[in-house]
């Protein structure tokens, strides 16, 4: 893969500065323990260790309990970045104590920090994951003729090298028969820079992590070309802590993990309210936040599952494909002891039972008000968000969902967003941005044209239909 790079020193400086918002405080007063938390407000499947955690004050509350019990005083400093790379740079410099980032950046974090015992990190929890890889996607301009990833051969693609979005691109290109080393030119850009490059047609595609693909599509600035779920490889974001800091202040790490469990429980129990808080804290539209963090989207589960760690081990070769990185012993890097202790101390369920579960803790439930049936199948269930409603209304299947939209429009109501799972891969997506097919009386939504084409290949009677047409013609 031809990669347009900065010089190493310039790159390091750029990563350390890019998209960094520091809520910096003065040095902690004598007798006060300071903890610096690096997070990514716009990488919204990390919110239980960042944006939502901060908004709810769970960490500060947990630390205050220690103080009230006769312990030390604590000071929390939050540092917001656009990607995981600058968080790693700050951890190498021993300036961030706890950070969150995606799976590929976590590999780099573990590799880069292990040379210095004071900087050395360990993976202590997961924030959110998708079992198939749907958290990373490739988008193209709306007027792009590309129908599948193979159409990008020889083109320029924007990605943040070392990010989860870039890692997915490398795997996807290989599977598509495109040589990742020579078949495309990757421009190493921060997400917002890449978004601008895509809009101005300086690049043919953008490969990024949440929430960028959904944001650009929701803003009508791009369309989805490749759904990372096609890889059928788990992707996740997680939390790393500096081992030296955790050894010096084990109570802080325990408080952080307990607070993360608090945030995770809140999000899974009240996803719509959580999306509002995250939208306000990140500056992202609530419709985009709820796309990824709503029921049936990202699985917010803190446990270090075997399938996630197995996929993580398979990703190690990625390190060597992008530069000179030291090998990383994943088994030594992963440490579940503190999280197990947090589960036991908080009473938030049984760790081993949660570890063994592969079910998304948050799914669409309730009674479909249009079809008057219970919503029971996550592979079909969607939601219709009518402006002014207390929360989105559930739909049992795509047909019921289209009827709900039809009814709302007939009543003159404004629809904020409609969410539906992809018929092939199950990825939660915007219904009005999906590719729809009609087969008899059945309506099938797909995230990408390639997915719809695959379906039509084995179902020749399925016919393309626009979302607007489907809403107009659907019948009970």
Describe the role of every protein-language-model region.
Residues 28-179, 185-188, 204, 233:
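Short, glycine-/small- and polar/acidic-enriched structural segments
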Residues 1-9:
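Bacterial N-terminal signal peptides that target proteins for export
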Residues 44, 249-326:
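Secondary-structure end/capping motifs
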Residues 186, 192-281, 399, 407-426:
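Pocket-lining segment of extracytoplasmic ligand-binding domains
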Residues 320-365:
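Conserved C-terminal helix/tail region of periplasmic/extracytoplasmic solute-binding proteins
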Residues 14-19:
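C-terminal motif of bacterial Sec signal peptides marking the signal peptidase cleavage site
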Residues 20-24:
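Bacterial signal peptide processing site
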Residues 368-371:
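Short cysteine-rich clusters marking metal-coordination/redox-active sites
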